[in-house]
Protein backbone atom coordinates (compact mmCIF):
# COMPACT_ATOMS: atom_id res chain seq x y z
CA UNK A 1 0.00 0.00 0.00
CA UNK A 2 1.34 3.40 -1.01
CA UNK A 3 1.82 5.88 1.82
CA UNK A 4 0.77 9.51 1.41
CA UNK A 5 3.37 12.12 0.43
CA UNK A 6 3.08 14.03 3.71
CA UNK A 7 4.00 10.84 5.59
CA UNK A 8 7.19 10.46 3.54
CA UNK A 9 8.16 14.06 4.21
CA UNK A 10 7.40 13.62 7.89
CA UNK A 11 9.69 10.60 7.93
CA UNK A 12 12.47 12.56 6.13
CA UNK A 13 12.23 15.42 8.62
CA UNK A 14 12.14 13.04 11.60
CA UNK A 15 15.23 11.16 10.43
CA UNK A 16 17.04 14.42 9.63
CA UNK A 17 16.16 15.82 13.05
CA UNK A 18 17.38 12.59 14.66
CA UNK A 19 20.74 12.72 12.84
CA UNK A 20 21.30 16.39 13.64
CA UNK A 21 20.16 15.94 17.25
CA UNK A 22 22.51 12.98 17.70
CA UNK A 23 25.38 15.06 16.31
CA UNK A 24 24.62 17.96 18.64
CA UNK A 25 24.40 15.65 21.66
CA UNK A 26 27.63 13.87 20.74
CA UNK A 27 29.39 17.22 20.34
CA UNK A 28 28.02 18.55 23.62
CA UNK A 29 28.95 15.52 25.73
CA UNK A 30 32.27 14.56 24.12
CA UNK A 31 33.91 17.98 23.79
CA UNK A 32 35.90 18.89 26.93
CA UNK A 33 35.45 22.25 28.58
CA UNK A 34 38.37 24.65 28.88
CA UNK A 35 38.90 23.69 32.52
CA UNK A 36 38.95 19.97 31.70
CA UNK A 37 41.38 20.56 28.86
CA UNK A 38 43.74 22.58 31.08
CA UNK A 39 43.48 19.98 33.84
CA UNK A 40 44.49 17.26 31.35
CA UNK A 41 47.71 19.08 30.43
CA UNK A 42 51.05 18.00 31.80
CA UNK A 43 52.30 20.08 34.75
CA UNK A 44 54.92 21.84 32.61
CA UNK A 45 52.39 22.85 29.96
CA UNK A 46 49.91 23.94 32.63
CA UNK A 47 52.58 26.18 34.19
CA UNK A 48 53.42 27.65 30.79
CA UNK A 49 49.72 28.26 30.11
CA UNK A 50 49.31 30.09 33.42
CA UNK A 51 52.45 32.19 32.82
CA UNK A 52 51.33 33.25 29.35
CA UNK A 53 47.70 33.92 30.30
CA UNK A 54 48.36 37.55 31.28
CA UNK A 55 50.28 38.11 28.05
CA UNK A 56 47.35 36.81 25.99
CA UNK A 57 44.91 38.98 27.94
CA UNK A 58 47.08 42.06 27.37
CA UNK A 59 47.28 41.27 23.65
CA UNK A 60 43.51 40.91 23.49
CA UNK A 61 42.97 44.24 25.28
CA UNK A 62 45.41 45.97 22.92
CA UNK A 63 43.63 44.47 19.91
CA UNK A 64 40.24 45.66 21.21
CA UNK A 65 41.66 49.16 21.75
CA UNK A 66 42.93 49.24 18.16
CA UNK A 67 39.62 47.91 16.81
CA UNK A 68 37.66 50.60 18.68
CA UNK A 69 40.07 53.27 17.46
CA UNK A 70 39.76 52.02 13.87
CA UNK A 71 35.96 51.84 14.09
CA UNK A 72 35.77 55.44 15.31
CA UNK A 73 37.95 56.78 12.47
CA UNK A 74 36.81 57.75 8.99
CA UNK A 75 39.35 55.56 7.17
CA UNK A 76 38.16 52.69 4.96
CA UNK A 77 37.70 49.25 6.46
CA UNK A 78 40.52 47.69 4.44
CA UNK A 79 43.05 50.15 5.87
CA UNK A 80 44.38 48.11 8.78
CA UNK A 81 46.21 50.98 10.47
CA UNK A 82 48.54 49.82 13.26
CA UNK A 83 47.43 46.20 12.80
CA UNK A 84 49.70 44.41 10.37
CA UNK A 85 48.05 42.52 7.54
CA UNK A 86 48.30 38.73 7.84
CA UNK A 87 49.48 38.57 4.23
CA UNK A 88 52.51 40.71 5.00
CA UNK A 89 54.86 38.05 6.32
CA UNK A 90 57.95 40.22 6.00
CA UNK A 91 56.75 42.52 8.76
CA UNK A 92 58.34 43.16 12.11
CA UNK A 93 55.93 40.85 13.92
CA UNK A 94 57.23 37.72 12.18
CA UNK A 95 60.81 38.69 13.03
CA UNK A 96 59.97 39.49 16.63
CA UNK A 97 58.12 36.18 16.97
CA UNK A 98 61.16 34.32 15.61
CA UNK A 99 63.44 36.25 17.96
CA UNK A 100 61.15 35.51 20.91
CA UNK A 101 61.11 31.80 20.05
CA UNK A 102 64.90 31.80 19.70
CA UNK A 103 65.42 33.52 23.06
CA UNK A 104 62.98 31.14 24.71
CA UNK A 105 64.72 28.11 23.19
CA UNK A 106 68.10 29.40 24.40
CA UNK A 107 66.69 29.88 27.89
CA UNK A 108 65.32 26.32 27.93
CA UNK A 109 68.70 25.00 26.75
CA UNK A 110 70.52 26.95 29.47
CA UNK A 111 68.20 25.58 32.15
CA UNK A 112 68.66 22.05 30.82
CA UNK A 113 72.45 22.45 30.76
CA UNK A 114 72.43 23.78 34.33
CA UNK A 115 70.33 20.82 35.46
CA UNK A 116 72.68 18.39 33.71
CA UNK A 117 75.74 20.05 35.28
CA UNK A 118 74.22 19.78 38.75
CA UNK A 119 73.30 16.15 38.15
CA UNK A 120 76.81 15.40 36.86
CA UNK A 121 78.35 17.07 39.91
CA UNK A 122 76.26 14.94 42.28
CA UNK A 123 77.23 11.79 40.36
CA UNK A 124 80.92 12.77 40.55
CA UNK A 125 80.61 13.43 44.26
CA UNK A 126 78.93 10.07 44.84
CA UNK A 127 81.60 8.32 42.76
CA UNK A 128 84.40 10.03 44.68
CA UNK A 129 82.80 9.07 48.00
CA UNK A 130 82.37 5.46 46.88
CA UNK A 131 85.99 5.30 45.63
CA UNK A 132 87.25 6.75 48.91
CA UNK A 133 85.19 4.23 50.86
CA UNK A 134 86.53 1.28 48.84
CA UNK A 135 90.11 2.57 49.06
CA UNK A 136 89.89 2.94 52.83
CA UNK A 137 88.69 -0.68 53.21
CA UNK A 138 91.40 -2.21 51.02
CA UNK A 139 95.12 -2.18 51.55
CA UNK A 140 98.02 -2.77 49.22
CA UNK A 141 99.02 -6.03 50.87
CA UNK A 142 96.61 -8.94 51.05
CA UNK A 143 97.73 -10.15 54.56
UniProtKB/Swiss-Prot annotation:
One of its GO terms (biological process) is mitochondrial respiratory chain complex III assembly. The keyword Chaperone applies. It holds the Pfam family CBP4. InterPro entries: Cbp4. Its main location: mitochondrion. The chain crosses the membrane at residues 5-27. Residues 124-143 are annotated as: Disordered. Keywords: Chaperone, Coiled coil, Membrane, Mitochondrion, Mitochondrion inner membrane, Transmembrane, Transmembrane helix. Residues 95-139 form a coiled coil. It is found in: Mitochondrion inner membrane. It is a single-pass membrane protein. One of its GO terms (cellular component) is mitochondrial membrane. Belongs to the CBP4 family. Essential for the assembly of ubiquinol-cytochrome c reductase. It has a direct effect on the correct occurrence of the Rieske protein, core 4, core 5 and apocytochrome b. This is Assembly factor CBP4. It comes from Eremothecium gossypii (strain ATCC 10895 / CBS 109.51 / FGSC 9923 / NRRL Y-1056). The lineage of its organism: Eukaryota, Fungi, Dikarya, Ascomycota, Saccharomycotina.
Amino acid sequence: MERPVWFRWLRVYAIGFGIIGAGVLLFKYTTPTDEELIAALSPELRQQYERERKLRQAEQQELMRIVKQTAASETPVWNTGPIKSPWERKGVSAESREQFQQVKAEQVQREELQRIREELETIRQQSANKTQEIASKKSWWPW
